[in-house]
């Protein structure tokens, strides 16, 4: 699940011209600019290729521009993903393990990167197609297990999104209690390393 998010629905691209894709992408960018920060509760449902529910969960989700991300799964098994703009931390309390990754390498492989990026270079890597109140984001080159992300809005507010992977699984995330990040909430994006945990610092392995 963590890999599906970091690296977490189709309309045929033959039906759309490049100009339409560009317009759809700009519309999505404009909507996300209006969502410079967001905190919400989420409910998660994962279905397999046969549309059978294989996992459910709930927790807290937050994002802030630029490049800050918080994901706290509280049920059924606790886990955290925190991006502070430079590094991405994945914490598994049950395994007592923390994995640290370079943020850009971890998140850029996924269409979900567009939720926290505004730069042209990142957006040029994805095709965006509008579908009523939703936008499907697909990488132009498949470099990860994520095939697409669909984000949906209600009254200009991010309401839900889903992630489709190459195994045929679909992870649906429905948001509630949406609100802007407060000064107090900014602490969510600063990961505090717990005591007595194993640390797998993968930044060293990818350092130049």
From Swiss-Prot:
Annotated Gene3D superfamilies: Lipoprotein localisation LolA/LolB/LppX (2.50.20.10)
Signal peptide (residue range): 1-22
CDD domains: LolA
InterPro entries: LolA/LolB/LppX, OM_lipoprot_carrier_LolA-like, OM_lipoprot_carrier_LolA_Pbac
Annotated localization: Periplasm
Keywords for this protein: Chaperone, Periplasm, Protein transport, Signal, Transport
Any Pfam family the entry gives: LolA
Subunit structure, interactors included: Monomer.
Family of the protein in this entry: Belongs to the LolA family.
The protein, known as: Outer-membrane lipoprotein carrier protein
Lineage: Bacteria, Pseudomonadati, Pseudomonadota, Gammaproteobacteria, Alteromonadales
């Amino acid at each position: 699940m963590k890999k599906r998010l970091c690296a977490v629905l189709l309309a045929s691209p033959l039906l759309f011209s490049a100009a339409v894709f560009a317009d759809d992408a700009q519309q999505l960018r404009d909507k996300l600019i209006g969502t410079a920060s967001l905190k919400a509760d989420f409910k998660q449902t994962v279905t397999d290729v046969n549309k059978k529910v294989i996992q459910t969960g709930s927790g807290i989700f937050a994002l802030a521009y630029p490049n800050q991300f918080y994901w706290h799964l509280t049920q059924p098994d606790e886990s955290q993903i925190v991006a502070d703009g430079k590094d991405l931390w994945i914490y598994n309390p049950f395994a007592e393990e923390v994995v640290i990754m370079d943020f850009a390498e971890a998140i850029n492989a996924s269409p979900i990167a567009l939720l926290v990026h505004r730069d042209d270079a990142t957006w040029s890597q994805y095709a965006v197609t509008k579908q009523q109140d939703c936008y499907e984001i697909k990488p132009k080159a498949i470099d990860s297990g994520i095939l697409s992300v669909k984000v949906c809005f209600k009254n200009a507010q991010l309401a839900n999104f889903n992630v489709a992977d190459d195994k045929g699984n679909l992870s649906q995330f429905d948001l509630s209690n949406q609100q802007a990040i407060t000064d107090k909430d900014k602490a969510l994006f600063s990961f505090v390393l717990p005591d007595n945990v194993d640390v797998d610092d993968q930044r060293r392995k990818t350092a130049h």
